[in-house]
């Protein structure tokens, strides 16, 4: 086991008992939602994973170590503290070396999960290709990580603040399977259907588990995206949310917000403009992903 990893007691017990472990990121807690809803969401999501037969492992960087599984106090710390670093692949060595607090993104959570031998990871939405990428080249490191790190990511598609068309094209170029679970089109985070058709879709988790096994047994390194739409009763009307997203993107451009600050800014702005409706939808879709992700992990290890 890597010297930089510390596994929580719950994760160690789960591994010893041969239970499936499901990773969770910490950026969603520190940068993706306001306090105290973020901490409540994190605890509820962990419980949903337990209730569906798997063991949750929220991942974060604390005091020069990669923590695989956080205590209640640590979840509270990540939810309520200001100035926690947002850590992607590029930032991991520096944040660990400097012993700072670091919240893991999709990319770095995949890396840490892989180091710990964890094959499944639940999140809200993927990062991807940002709108206006033709001039900024702003493409999330999440996509390249999926091309090289063998972890399955269960999400509600890519975040709808992104250029979803380009994101799907990029994943195709990198050979990353994007499987729609009970959907033939890519879900768009707050809404169930982006209108973009997927090459792969499955009605049953057993089919997805089998496909993932075959992929890795063939020596095809890299992740799999399981795109699981937000439940119908929780989705926001596309005509409503898409206009708000466009306004928020425009404001970010005007303010010159770029790089890793753009996603937290946009999500915060959208919560403000929807008077909290987007936050409620975000929490619901993460919980739904946790249920599906835990069940998929159980299926995989049968």
Swiss-Prot record:
Keywords per UniProt: Glycosidase, Hydrolase, Lyase, Manganese, Metal-binding
Family annotation (Gene3D superfamilies): Indigoidine synthase domain
GO cellular component: cytoplasm
Cofactor requirements of the protein: Mn(2+)
EC number: 4.2.1.70
Cofactor remark: Binds 1 Mn(2+) ion per subunit.
List of residues binding substrate: 86, 106, 140-142
SUPFAM superfamilies: Indigoidine synthase A-like
Catalysed conversion reaction: D-ribose 5-phosphate + uracil = psi-UMP + H2O
GO biological process: nucleobase catabolic process
Positions of the catalytic residues: 25, 159
One Pfam family, short name: Indigoidine_A
Record-listed Mn(2+) binding positions: 138
Enzyme class: lyase
GO MF terms held by the record: hydrolase activity, acting on glycosyl bonds; metal ion binding; pseudouridylate synthase activity
Role, per record: Catalyzes the reversible cleavage of pseudouridine 5'-phosphate (PsiMP) to ribose 5-phosphate and uracil. Functions biologically in the cleavage direction, as part of a pseudouridine degradation pathway.
HAMAP family registered for this protein in UniProt: PsiMP_glycosidase (MF_01876)
Record note on quaternary structure: Homotrimer.
PANTHER family: CARBOHYDRATE KINASE PFKB DOMAIN-CONTAINING PROTEIN (PTHR42909:SF1), ZGC:136858 (PTHR42909)
Family (UniProt): Belongs to the pseudouridine-5'-phosphate glycosidase family.
Protein name as annotated: Pseudouridine-5'-phosphate glycosidase
Gene that this sequence comes from: psuG
